[in-house]
């Protein structure tokens, strides 16, 4: 039979694209489990992803991997079977195709919804490589991985499920106890059948984000924890029978949104570690040239208008996980083995932080993306490209003044700063995407040199520091409070203190004093302090300190005038833009608070604001209040009621119905979305367009 290469997406973003290839399927019998080996004694983990499609046109095979450079290989990707098919038909994705679920013999199988299945049976288990025979139980990439382990007994292999393109069914799987049970049982079956040492869930993303057509629901936050808990239960039970430790890991997003949409502290207690994807912070989806994986925040990026620059960097992403309760030893830092490019970037700043015409029209395999080995061979200080260094963000970049192309990437120098960060924070190691991008082993050699993997595993520190004592206020102004406290102790060592204003983190310091600024004059605040150690353990809170800021010097008690002429200037399905006439004040207006009903929606310094994250076709009522430096707040402006735009549907298109004959190409609407019929059929209950992508394609 003819099969199609199923993977066109790289690990986090749809911007990676691989063309489809026609492949011949090979039928092979089942596989005999290899003997279990002892867990490697590693002081740091070095986890490398190997994508199945590397063995196609990229011609980078498992045999090309140097197993001494990694401790774990994550094989990407397996998928989830649902209604007899897998894949993702979402037209916004890089590969909107589905296939029947198949076994290692490329035979169609009938399995329950939520079962883990091979992503590409031909390349996974069917293709013969040198030394293979036509009738051996398992061939393909998976057999090659097992051969690699036979000669390197400390190497571990992990099957990664999902990825950017194939995360469409995770929410459905996690939603019920029945499907969680199916998924967890199939994980055990998959590991035993193909001799993997663990399973890695790459769900992109719970609650929100990812491809538009992915299943998602608010309950994903709690359901993800339940799913992982069930997998852990099944893996531990299987491990007790098989005499080995089965690993469970996840790939996590690096944004504050991901941390808010998951129960990271609970997840960390379940999994062996978390691979945080600290890359893809900037790319061709925006027109401002910026860095793929900046280690530190660069204020110049914010000044140039780079979106979310203060949080879209490696340090902020990792710290967000630590602050959410992930122990440092369970956090493995992501490193990209590729760069991202833009075209039409002005020469100012050597192309950095410039408004460009768009993403690069060229790349190694996809436009806009450059493998590191390709950059080494053809770009770095070659062919008109000059290497520059951003010493704040700690990353290199290339600029070609002739063609105005800017490329952000990582090299051995920037990787060195990232490994130093790993050590300074006591993190568990490094993960990288992906092995075929570093064919000269330049970056792998750097990781291996900086992160020794042959020592004794230090015991996991789970002891929290003692509670900071005698928290007190030592200074107060109109806009700041200075606090002090007695030092905590720890079995290993205290690394710092988090200071909280109410429930919100106000600042983090390494000493026993802190000044919290930006407060409102004449206002009462309550502060507590928690100590932390290198493993990410937090102490209980100190005694609460309640203190009031002083009145503004000069006795300014006069509030600004109320804003006037509040009006809506634009509406979309999810946002409303407002404008108003400026207020006046005896000293000066410092900003405006915009309220959605009684809730504060945003604070701005100008006289316009856009409120996002709203529901379509819904009415909202807004008011605005002005404020000054003394903390005086005006009366509310006039109220304005505005309705967001409705979701657009195709006029004249009929709603989908049961027991109706449909022809190929016919359009219907279902749950507010438009679908095109792919095959003639008569509809039945359960064949709703959202459930049967083999029959319907979302428009």
From Swiss-Prot:
PROSITE patterns: FN3, GH18_1, GH18_2
Segments of this protein annotated with the region Disordered: 449-471
Domain of life: Bacteria
Positions of the GH18 domain: 44-454
Biological process annotations from GO: chitin catabolic process; polysaccharide catabolic process
Enzymatic class: hydrolase
Keywords on record: Carbohydrate metabolism, Chitin degradation, Glycosidase, Hydrolase, Polysaccharide degradation, Repeat, Signal
UniProt GO molecular function: carbohydrate binding; chitin binding; endochitinase activity
Protein name: Chitinase A1
Gene this protein is translated from: chiA1
